[in-house]
Amino acid sequence: AFLCNQDRISGTDSLGGFGYDLDLSVPFVTTAIHAGHRVRSELAPLMAISEKDRLAEEDTGTDRIIRACPSRIWGLDSRAEYDLNRPPELALPMTPEMFWDIRVYESSPTDAMNRRSLEKYAAFYRFSATVVKVLLDRFGACIFYDIHSYNIQRQVDKGHRAPPVFNLGTRGIDRARWEKPVAAWLDHLGQIKIPNRLTTVAENDVFGGMGEFCCRLTQWDPNILVLPTEVSKIYMDEHSGVVHNSKILALKNGLAKAIRAHGQLFQSSYT
């Protein structure tokens, strides 16, 4: 209800799991749900995973990359605590198989601790549902740019010769219905300029876009389009965690420009 009569709202969720800076006068939102690095103080002493290994699996810097976008939501908690892009029954990494064969916990969290993690997970989706309802009530359709980043070396190790800078996953959406905005988004991504790097774009190459965020929102209403967009970690040394600020800046400016143009095109065509 607190969103219904407002155009601009920003803050942090009461449980602290995510931040938001929303412009509800436009039908498009950019998210970086895996940007977070924080782990609750009650969980940190139980963990076996090193901070370096945890950082490698997080989408480091994606909150900075979306910072110039007009309307955005970003995660603050580490996906080693709970993963917003998995269904709730798989969101807590209790075994190495659930976290790229990395053992997250030395000692298992209590049931109460796990409940608190899942409460933060649920709070994110309740908030997202409220945002979606406001946008659908106002515009009749809305679009979410679901921004992630991925480790290049892992794809190379799998035999991928040239992992793309941008990968759009469309296996979780009605590809035929959204043909025009999908094609336009791929085109906009290809126009983003990055220092000393050829911008390459692919669809369903390294990822198919079947994460929980896309699948859940897509099931809520047929007039919601989610575009799961992976950026390769060209903007950092994925082994040391050192970020290259010039590339972050180029991605931030390029993505904001692309989203404004594409979002306005979506608004004129579908709302």
Which sequence ranges carry the predicted segments?
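N-terminal catalytic or cofactor-binding beta/alpha core of small enzyme domains
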Residues: A1-T271
